[in-house]
């Protein structure tokens, strides 16, 4: 089984997309870090959400914050919740109201003006993320969006948006998790002085 070309092209494509992040998205990544840190300094909670692979990324980033990002960095837990993690709430909402309301209903219940909603969507067109953004804004929350391609319907709807310059879902998700890790580093450094 020979897959040298496939493997090489996947790695090169991933490198190419990530190389574009630094010059074009550095200010937005820094701005997102500031929004998250400011919320946490004000006793806010970070609410993450996504669908499919982005759901896994949302849960991953929230877990890094609640537990710890870097091994050996002992620190207080950071309040971060992945809204896509409670199966009872998700299935009840999908059954009773519809899948598009999964995150909106939870933000309606819990979101406060000191909190931040962080939505991950590779297309920028996920209806449940769109409704969550609208609910977050109603609650006076800040919104950070990790998007892909042209940003979709969510382009221009956030306080800070980070749009990955690719239309390939895998490349967008790889970049989203990289940015999530960078944001974890910024938070640990700003709140606890950890490198």
UniProtKB/Swiss-Prot annotation:
Residues 36-195 form the SIS domain. One of its GO terms (molecular function) is D-sedoheptulose 7-phosphate isomerase activity. One of its GO terms (cellular component) is cytoplasm. Substrate binds at residues 51-53, 64, 95-96, 121-123, 126, 173. Its EC number is 5.3.1.28. GO terms for biological process: carbohydrate metabolic process; D-glycero-D-manno-heptose 7-phosphate biosynthetic process. It is found in: Cytoplasm. Its cofactor is Zn(2+). Gene3D superfamilies: Glucose-6-phosphate isomerase like protein, domain 1 (3.40.50.10490). Binds 1 zinc ion per subunit. SUPFAM superfamilies: SIS domain (SSF53697). Its main location: cytoplasm. Keywords: Carbohydrate metabolism, Cytoplasm, Isomerase, Metal-binding, Zinc. It is an enzyme of class 5 (isomerase). Pathway: Carbohydrate biosynthesis; D-glycero-D-manno-heptose 7-phosphate biosynthesis; D-glycero-alpha-D-manno-heptose 7-phosphate and D-glycero-beta-D-manno-heptose 7-phosphate from sedoheptulose 7-phosphate: step 1/1. InterPro entries: GmhA/DiaA (IPR035461), Phosphoheptose_Isoase (IPR004515), SIS_dom (IPR001347), SIS_dom_sf (IPR046348), SIS_GmhA/DiaA_subfam (IPR050099). It catalyses: 2 D-sedoheptulose 7-phosphate = D-glycero-alpha-D-manno-heptose 7-phosphate + D-glycero-beta-D-manno-heptose 7-phosphate. Zn(2+) binds at residues 60, 64, 173, 181. Catalyzes the isomerization of sedoheptulose 7-phosphate in D-glycero-D-manno-heptose 7-phosphate. Belongs to the SIS family. GmhA subfamily. HAMAP family: GmhA. The reaction produces a racemic mixture of D-glycero-alpha-D-manno-heptose 7-phosphate and D-glycero-beta-D-manno-heptose 7-phosphate. This is Phosphoheptose isomerase. It comes from Leptospira biflexa serovar Patoc (strain Patoc 1 / ATCC 23582 / Paris). The gene is gmhA.
């Amino acid at each position: 089984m020979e897959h040298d070309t496939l493997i090489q092209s996947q790695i090169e494509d991933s490198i190419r997309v990530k190389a574009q992040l630094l010059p074009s998205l550095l200010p937005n990544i820094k701005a997102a870090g500031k929004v998250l840190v400011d919320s946490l300094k004000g006793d806010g909670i970070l609410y993450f959400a996504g669908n499919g692979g982005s759901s896994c990324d949302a849960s991953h980033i929230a877990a890094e914050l609640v537990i710890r990002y870097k091994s050996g960095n002992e620190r207080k837990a950071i309040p971060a919740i992945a809204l896509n993690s409670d199966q009872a709430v998700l299935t009840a909402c999908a059954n009773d109201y519809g899948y598009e309301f999964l995150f909106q209903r939870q933000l309606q219940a819990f979101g406060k003006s000191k909190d931040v909603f962080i939505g991950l969507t590779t297309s920028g067109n996920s209806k449940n993320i769109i409704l969550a953004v609208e609910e977050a804004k109603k609650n006076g929350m800040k919104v950070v969006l990790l998007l892909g391609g042209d940003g979709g319907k969510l382009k221009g709807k956030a306080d800070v948006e980070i749009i990955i310059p690719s239309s390939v879902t895998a490349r967008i998700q790889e970049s989203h998790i990289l940015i999530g890790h960078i944001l974890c580093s910024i938070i640990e450094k700003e709140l606890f002085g950890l490198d």
